[in-house]
Amino acid sequence: MKPSMAILLVIALIIFSLDKSYSANDKPIGKCGDAKRNKPCLACSHRSSIADFYSKCCTYDAVYNGCLDKLRH
């Protein structure tokens, strides 16, 4: 095997292992790392026609509180 091929193989293995370790530790965005907030935001995002509702619910307290009101009624 040529040295350049060996170097490329090692680089590919390093990138693959780093990608796996980072993707395994993905957490929900914003404040939705907390399961208490994540579940209502998911439920409201499925009911909403707004494309980025989940991210807004996780980020903004006013949207989250509105979501809770919708789920209560």
UniProtKB/Swiss-Prot annotation:
Tissue: Expressed by the venom gland.
Subcellular location: Secreted
GO cellular component: a single term: extracellular region
Post-translational modification: Contains 3 disulfide bonds.
Gene3D superfamilies: 1.10.60.50
Signal peptide, first to last residue: 1-23
Protein name: Kappa-scoloptoxin(03)-Ssm1b
UniProt keyword list: Disulfide bond, Ion channel impairing toxin, Neurotoxin, Potassium channel impairing toxin, Secreted, Signal, Toxin, Voltage-gated potassium channel impairing toxin
Main location, first listed in the record: secreted
Disulphide-bonded residues: 32-58, 41-57, 44-67
Organism domain of life: Eukaryota
Function text: Inhibits voltage-gated potassium channels.
One of the record's GO molecular function terms: toxin activity
Organism from which the protein derives: Scolopendra mutilans
Keyword Secreted: yes
UniProt lineage: Eukaryota, Metazoa, Ecdysozoa, Arthropoda, Myriapoda
